[in-house]
Regions:
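Conserved beta3 strand of the protein kinase N-lobe
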Residues: 133-134
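Acidic/histidine-enriched active-site and ligand-binding environments that engage anionic O-linkages
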Residues: 147-157
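ATP-binding N-terminal substructure of ATP-dependent carboxylate-amine bond-forming enzymes
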Residues: 1-126, 138-147, 397
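Conserved, charged catalytic cores of large soluble enzymes
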Residues: 172
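ATP-dependent carboxylate activation and anion-phosphoryl transfer catalytic cores
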Residues: 7-23, 48, 71-73, 96, ...
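A short acidic, helix-capping loop that chelates divalent metal ions and anchors anionic groups
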Residues: 166-168
Length: 449
């Protein structure tokens, strides 16, 4: 096991990894920007190193500064968290070339899965079903593009090969709009991701977003930890996640889970990963694989009893997975609400000082947050300041616990989206379960403030 790990991230995930290190008896080095200097988790760190000013490119995306911090503190490994450099293959490569262990997959795995075209090809090869579409990057010839769209069938969606986080995609309903949409997506992709390549997929009208959590070690062992339903989204950004997915037969989940685990063995994957699917009419279609820990990992931890972050660290240290597929049992139901510092209905970010922070408690309630009374939420980063996660024996009990937890939560000084969550937890369609990925946006349009 490592003696010391550097955590190359901020906020709630930095604190989450710090806690995992403490449990494993590993020293944690935190890096921070000038905007995060006063954060409590920085003050609680074994060691902390300032890596630059508030702007992300000069701090949390600054590879030389992060690697230098690992060198001066004698860390042995670097955990990237999620976001920032977590899915940057060049960073993973530089970390390992500098003599540190990257707590995540190899740079090659990240490269394959980070490019949506090569990821899709790898998944198809491993027998994982994918959304019908162009089997690779779209050509430049407009005639060929139109031919591909015709064979796939409208509506289609144009996606950036290097995209992610819900950016770099465009839905096209008619041939007349096709070529312009491809050109615009290419231009955007080149600017945003440094890669203008785009591909085409059939646009599913009313799918659900279901993902399979994978853990794999360096000894060709890979398991799946059930599924999560992340269909409650706004602008392709997840708002509420739950596990297991309501109303999907276990046999279907087992079949797709086994295929995902087999695919990971085939490509010598290591660490935590998530295969994301669109699910419609009883069919799963793989859309991408995330090569990092997910924001919503706690719902899976709750239903399986497996600590995903600790396991990430253990397999990076060369240990075998301490469990087999047979050991993994799904128990009860878990729901997570992301708490964002923003207007709950207009979604305008609300940075500033939290004058009062009171987190909920009680049986089956977990709060993952770096916030506290008098904490200043900087305007420089993502608006998420925490997550409320609940677990119950049944989905109904989990919903009841979440309603109570949201009512108990008190945040003053800034706006948060907690009022939105309170309303969604009593919404009849959400309570019934199985809403599709468009439901939240339709709900918001019908409940305009």
């Amino acid at each position: 096991m490592f003696q010391k790990i550097l955590i190359a991230n901020r906020g709630e995930i930095a604190l989450r990894v710090q806690r995992a290190c403490r449990e494993l008896g590993v020293k944690a080095v935190m890096v921070y920007s000038e905007a995060d200097r006063e954060a409590k988790y920085i003050k609680l760190a074994d060691e902390a190193v300032c890596i630059g000013p508030a702007a992300s490119p000069l701090s949390y995306l600054n590879m030389p500064a992060i690697i230098a911090a690992a060198e001066v503190t004698d860390a042995e490994a670097i955990h990237p968290g999620y976001g920032f450099l977590s899915e940057n293959a060049d960073f993973a490569e530089r970390v390992e070339k500098s003599g540190f262990q990257f707590i995540g997959p190899t740079a090659d795995s990240i490269r394959i899965m980070g490019d949506k075209v090569s990821a899709k090809q790898a998944m198809i090869k491993a027998g994982v079903p994918c959304v019908p579409g162009s089997e690779g990057e779209l050509p430049d010839d407009p005639v060929q593009i139109k031919r591909i769209a015709k064979s796939v069938g409208y509506p289609v969606i144009i996606k950036a090969a290097g995209g992610g986080g819900g950016r770099g995609m465009r839905v096209v309903h008619t041939e007349a709009a096709l070529i312009n949409a491809v050109a615009m997506t290419k231009a955007e992709a080149g600017t945003a991701f440094g890669n203008p390549a785009v591909y085409m997929e059939k646009y599913l009208q009313n799918p659900r977003h279901i993902e399979i959590q994978i853990l794999a070690d360096k000894h060709k062992n890979a398991v799946y930890l059930g599924e999560r339903d992340c269909s409650m989204q706004r602008r392709h950004q997840k708002v509420i996640e739950e596990a297991p997915a309501p109303g999907i037969p276990r046999k279907l989940i087992e079949k797709i889970g086994e295929r995902c685990a087999a695919a990971c063995k085939k490509i010598n994957y290591r660490g935590a990963g998530t295969c994301e699917f669109l699910y419609e009419n009883g069919e799963f279609y793989c859309i991408e694989m995330n090569t990092r820990v997910q924001v919503e990992h706690p719902v899976t931890e709750y239903i399986t009893g497996i600590d995903i972050v600790k396991t990430q660290i253990m397999v990076a240290a060369g240990l075998k997975l301490p469990f087999t597929q047979r050991d993994i049992q799904v128990r009860g139901h878990s729901i997570e609400c992301r708490v964002n510092a923003e207007d709950p209905f207009k979604f305008i970010p609300s940075p500033g000082r939290i004058t009062m922070w009171h987190a909920p408690g009680g049986p089956g309630v977990r709060v993952d947050s770096h916030a506290y009374t008098n904490y200043y939420v900087p305007p420089n980063y993502d608006s998420m300041i925490g997550k409320i996660i609940v677990h119950g024996d049944t989905r109904d009990q989990a919903l009841a616990r979440m309603r109570t937890a949201l009512d108990e939560t008190l945040v003053e000084g800034i706006n948060t989206n907690i009022p939105l969550h309170r309303e969604l937890m009593v919404d009849a369609k959400f309570i019934a379960g199985g809403t599709n990925i468009h439901y939240l946006e339709e709900w918001l349009a019908a409940h305009k403030r």
